[in-house]
Amino acid sequence: MCIRDSPYTLLVAVMLSAQTTDKKVNEVTPFLFDLADSPQKMAMMEVEEIHSIIREIGLAPTKARNLKKMAQQIIQSGGAIRPDWEFLESLAGVGHKTAGVVMSQAFGIPAFPVDTHIHRLADRWGLSNGKNVAKTEYDLKKVFPEDTWNRRHLQIIFFGREYCPARGHDLSECPICSWASTKKRIKEGR
């Protein structure tokens, strides 16, 4: 089963992705989805069983509890994930960014999910001087047309991984940073 096979599997993968690498998520999700590719199956699992599958993921104990509770909440709400911000953000372990990824990637609804990586890049590139991800999301939504938000979110992530990593960042390696820093120096009169 692929992570993007359903809104549910996408939601689970995004919930697992916090504080860990995509590589780790991609390693554990096939085993998890073999046993629990629906909220109904996840709700039937014991927290300890979920934890044993995802133990290599950061914050695994909390995520295991949240996955079970989230599945139970979905069942109590009709059994399916709906494209509804309030519903998604009411689920255990689901914040605004996770809800945004599901809204944009599973349902095609314009959203601009901002995590710490996009927040850092938007600041480096001069697209936002936001002190938090909510302000950065607001700024990016003003910079980019709404019909581009879903793909811009992904483009920023992939571009950042390739040219503008958090660690070992070299201004000369990132075309945007080299341009943005030159623009900033000109503005500051250097």
Model-derived segments and spans:
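Catalytic cores of DNA base-excision repair glycosylases
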Residues: R4-R190
